[in-house]
Amino acid sequence: MDNVAQLETDTNFQSRKKITWGVFSVLLLFLVAGILYYFFVYRFYQSTDNAYVQADVTWVMPKISGEVMELLINDNQVVKKGETLAVLDHRDYQARYDQARSVVSLKEAALGVQQQNEKSARSSIIEANSGVVAAQADLARLKKEFERYQDLLKDGVITRQNFEGIQSQYLTAQAQLSKAQAAVNAAEAQLGSLQASRAQLLADIQSSHANLNLYQVDLASSKVVSPVSGKIGSLAIQKGSRVSPQTRLMAIIPENSLYVQANFKETQIEKMHIGQKVKLKLDAYPSLNFTGKIESFSPASGATFSLMPPDNATGNFNKVVQRIPVRIAIDSSPHIDLVKPGMSVSATVDLRT
């Protein structure tokens, strides 16, 4: 009996020994596999699940106030750049534009009259100058006659009455020359006044054109057009809504504007650089694989841009690992239409690329 019991004991010991060695071998194999995986795979990747899909959202806002007369799009609709999205009540702006255009027309007509008056004034100056030339010729002729008559009077050839006659003509010629010169001065003054008035009128026309352009801009702004091609979201108006400048009417997600913002720990970015490949997994579609590339790094940690950045100079210091936002461009994919801003993402950077 003792031999049988001893044999069973030895058999059990050997079995336990084999099991122990088997378990130890499996654990050792896993350990070696883990070490090999770390050295050949894991240490070349940095991952984070603190990542989200983002987009350069374009907010559409009106430039003028008014009631929405027509709404030409629906929420989630695809639109093209320059497409009319809504039409605001433009009757007031149309009336102001028409009035400003009438003012411009009136002032331009007045400018035409002014230019005609200037033309007449120049003709008057030419005519007055002709009168001066004629008066100067008469005066020169009569002056010679006057001087000749003076000599004849001294010699007693003519009577005093004859001399006074030519003297009267000579004085009249002097008066006529003065009158002609005064007419030239008056015509030139009139032209100067007209030219000054024209300068003022031109300034008024320029100002009127500026007002007309402003009203034209306001009138054109009654049509709300899409600044980019993309997809409508967050539609906040309907027909009959009253809007004002800086009111957010809707958002547009531009085409090809999606990217991932991954917030890596500061201890993870040592070997990261722009252009490295990134594997992306969306929580919404875990079976789909997306890829991307590092596009840029934030100039500061996320906490730096918060409304209340941490102040570690107060003496109450707790060291916290900071997060650095990394922008990742998403590569083209057949399933890119499934990617929406705000989705959660797991990002894994391949440090070997």
UniProtKB/Swiss-Prot annotation:
Database matches in InterPro entries: CusB-like_dom_1, MFP
GO terms (BP aspect): response to antibiotic; transmembrane transport
GO cellular component, one term: plasma membrane
Compartment(s) where it occurs, according to its Swiss-Prot or TrEMBL record: Cell inner membrane
Gene induction: Cotranscribed with emrB. Induced during osmotic stress.
Membrane topology according to the record: Single-pass membrane protein
Main location: membrane
Pfam family, one: HlyD_3
TM segment ranges: 21-41
Keywords: Antibiotic resistance, Cell inner membrane, Cell membrane, Coiled coil, Membrane, Transmembrane, Transmembrane helix, Transport
Residues in coiled coil: 132-204
Signal peptide (residue range): none
Reported function: Probably part of an efflux pump system that contributes to adaptation to osmotic stress and resistance to colistin.
Family label: Belongs to the membrane fusion protein (MFP) (TC 8.A.1) family.
Name by which UniProt lists this protein: Colistin resistance protein EmrA
Species of the source: Acinetobacter baumannii (strain ATCC 17978 / DSM 105126 / CIP 53.77 / LMG 1025 / NCDC KC755 / 5377)
Name of the encoding gene: emrA
